[in-house]
Amino acid sequence: MASKGTEGGHGGVERKEQQQQRGYQLPRDSRGSLEVFNPSSASSFRTAAAAPKSASPFLAIPDREEDNVVAQQRAAEWGLVLQTDHHTGLPQGVSARPSSGSARTSSEDNPQQQQSAAAIPRVSEELRAALSAFQQTFVVSDATHPNHPIMYASAGFFNMTGYTSKEVVGRNCRFLQGSGTDPHEIDKIRQSLANGSNYCGRILNYKKDGTPFWNLLTIAPIKDEDGRLLKFIGMQVEVSKYTEGKKDTVVRPNGLSESLIKYDARQKDHARSSVSELLLALKNPRSLSESSNNTLKRKSQESLSMSMTEVPSKRSSESGSRRNSRSGTRSSLQKINEVPDQGNRTRKSGLRAFMGFLGMGHGSVEKNMLKPRDEDPLIDSDDERPESFEDEFRRKEMRRGIDLATTLERIEKNFVITDPRLPDNPIIFASDSFLQLTEYNREEILGRNCRFLQGPETDRATVRKIRDAIDNQAEVTVQLINYTKSGKKFWNLFHLQPMRDQKGDVQYFIGVQLDGTEHVQDDAAKEGVVLVKKTADNIDEAAKELPDANLRPEDLWANHSKVVLPNPHMKDTASWRAIQKVLESGESIGLKHFRPVKPLGSGDTGSVHLVELLNTGEYFAMKAMDKSIMLNRNKVHRATAERQILDLLDHPFLPTLYASFQTKTHICLITDYCPGGELFVLLDNQPLKVLHEDAVRFYAAEVVVALEYLHCQGIIYRDLKPENILLHRDGHISLTDFDLSCLTSCRPQVFLPEDADEKKGRKNGSYPIFFAEPMRASNSFVGTEEYIAPEIITGAGHTSAVDWWALGILLYEMLYGYTPFRGKTRQRTFANILHKDIRFPASISVSLAARQLMYRLLHRDPANRLGSYEGANEIKGHPFFRGINWPLIRATAPPKLEIPLFSKDDMEKKGLVTNNRTDMF
């Protein structure tokens, strides 16, 4: 963190400056940090002198007056006031300093002020223990002091910078600056400190020995309940290894970035999530420890000590007898297998096999499972609602869609991608594993040719083979000696493969390295050759998701300027007729044809507005996305996919695309306006934040039908949540927001009934089943935190089964008012998703059929998840949906709600209030 004024260099500490900032010498802990986290610890105030027994109550330990003075001084360093007991004089905690700045004793504090300080840690030993448990590198500074002196620094900070605690505590962080530090970035930091706001950015800092390093700095303010600024927490992450550094400004001749991926946005997303944990510890260390215990321990006190990376093959409660689904792995799911297969999953569950032996079919198993038992294992005796969130930022963060990595970035192999269309065929992408293997930083190799790996013992004839393959645009696999940055020699099984575009022209070269300790014979190398070739094929497929880096910037958005043609089912609506009238006049639909009415929402890349097509009375929703933000956040291919997906949709429960166009700064999509708003708002408006089961059944059934249609089109939705379910005037749903969806090809299939007697089968209702699903799996890290499936977190590759997991979470939220795996932080939520058993509170009455449906949808193994074998047909046939007329669901009347979707006012007026504001961007 920086303050006004600059301090050049990065060496030592002046004693005079320390004395001016601190004014006096305070006690230090074993590392030398000030004991500012221990103002109320009894051990700090107890005296070794024995007090007269007759004058002392039982267990009372008198304190010396000077100890309390020292404690008051320590508390003052934090802008706090020490509170003491009226009778014993023992320290009882701390309270916030009044805004006037005058220190008052506890006897002068009124209850209002004590309540306003409730968000400040009062049990310092707990706070100290909580902070010491974090592995992050961070400092805490005093925001009440104009120079923002450091009051606490973690051990990681000393290790990263090389400074000692005596050289850090009491100083401003500007001593990390140097000649290469960007002054514009420092100005941003100063502005954030002055405004008491958040900051996240990458700056060049210097260690004590003068070594420069890239520091991803995240600053967050700590305020009391009255909004008074008390502290700043600054978390540092050294990202020199993985950031593109100053190469982020290097562009191609076409004006686009030379690097295939922009890493700053990725790293900032991770940093913001990590700093939220620290903020939680500072505000309430006790709740942090308690919630940790509740999260990591089952009710039986059995410890679930697995880390988030240790993914169990089954939950402890998931025995074969408790799952009723067909677990065979489908051949059509062509996964990108960048992690080892988790064993053979083709074995049927014990319950299913046993029932088959008894002659009971699938339906019989269902009926048997729905028989009530004396003791239902799915019901939790305690109502374990997740903790509430006082932090508004955290509440918004956990409900927004996240895009943390593309499939290409999650391939954990040593490889680079080069572009032969640029001079000297430079590297434009390098995997993290490649950086680890070669010991180079990403900044050091982007834009360079791969020859820097060569050394004195590298065989020139082998290098010539690689050059010939590049010239001939052919594949080649060789073994050669390469060298790491430190000069370490290693044998490299290297595979070069050209990547071609749709026209057959070479777009990139993919280079995959398999390191070894020694040269291996050709026969022994065959296994390695197969591995590197398979990896190259996966890289080729993953890289094709991204836009061609050699395109002109205007070509990236060309698809959005295409005319949208009406699909069969919607072409005769009033909205389409109004759009067609404009097109028939010879004009292209653009921003000038719409009048802004009001904003409907906003996100990371743009906003949604309610607009009226001029002089028609027809209202639409316009989604406007900022081009520059899309480029910086690696979302160009997401926007392209969303435009393609919307063009395919022709379904009553999905949006209709009427037009798309672009301005100099934005791309715009025109779709249906749903006056009923979000299902999330409807849920929130209900008295208990939940829906009755008949309403849940209605909305869930329409979601199933919509997902079935998407899967038949080869679309994996990947962002199902109440915020993305909009409601039409008639109360029916429309899924929206496809920027995180995956578009691939589809494989339709027909399953014949098992009964060979066709007439008998039809009599029993066993008709042929149509089933279609997306053929190719993805491995992108996308979704919404609370709804993300386990296989997305682990990076094992995911299919359309992630949508059925999200359906289970949606059902749970509609029935119970919250999601089952929500945690205080993103990391804890992900850990819960991977390890925590699903439980159903007994305080809310939910039918056994509903609980069993959620239980089967929330199976961590996607191969055993309900819907993995027959898709939506499996879910439609579940007893929870008994009574749903699936072919006529569109004609079903929406259920009555405690708080109706619309008030008694004129429905046409809802949300259509005129707004004269015309600047939407």
Curated annotation (Swiss-Prot):
Binds 2 FMN per subunit. Induction: Down-regulated by white light in dark-grown seedlings. ATP binds at residues 600-608, 623. Disulfide bonds: none annotated. One of its GO terms (cellular component) is plasma membrane. Pfam families: PAS_9, Pkinase. Keywords: ATP-binding, Chromophore, Flavoprotein, FMN, Kinase, Nucleotide-binding, Photoreceptor protein, Receptor, Repeat, Sensory transduction, Serine/threonine-protein kinase, Transferase. The active site is at 719 (proton acceptor). Its EC number is 2.7.11.1. Residues 1-59, 88-118, 286-347, 364-390 are annotated as: Disordered. FMN binds at residues 172-177, 190, 205, 215, 236, 449-454, 467, 482, 492, 513. It is an enzyme of class 2 (transferase). One of its GO terms (molecular function) is protein serine/threonine kinase activity. The modification S-4a-FMN cysteine is found at residues 173, 450. Residues 594-881 form the Protein kinase domain. Residues 40-51 have a biased composition (Low complexity). Residues 312-321, 364-376 have a biased composition (Basic and acidic residues). SUPFAM superfamilies: Protein kinase-like (PK-like) (SSF56112), PYP-like sensor domain (PAS domain) (SSF55785). Residues 1-11 have a biased composition (Gly residues). Autophosphorylated in response to blue light irradiation. InterPro entries: Kinase-like_dom_sf, PAC, PAS, PAS-assoc_C, PAS-like_dom_sf, Prot_kinase_dom, Protein_kinase_ATP_BS, Ser/Thr_kinase_AS. Highly expressed in coleoptiles of dark-grown seedlings. Its cofactor is FMN. Undergoes a photocycle characterized by fluorescence and absorption changes induced by blue light. Belongs to the protein kinase superfamily. Ser/Thr protein kinase family. This is Phototropin-1A. The gene is PHOT1A.
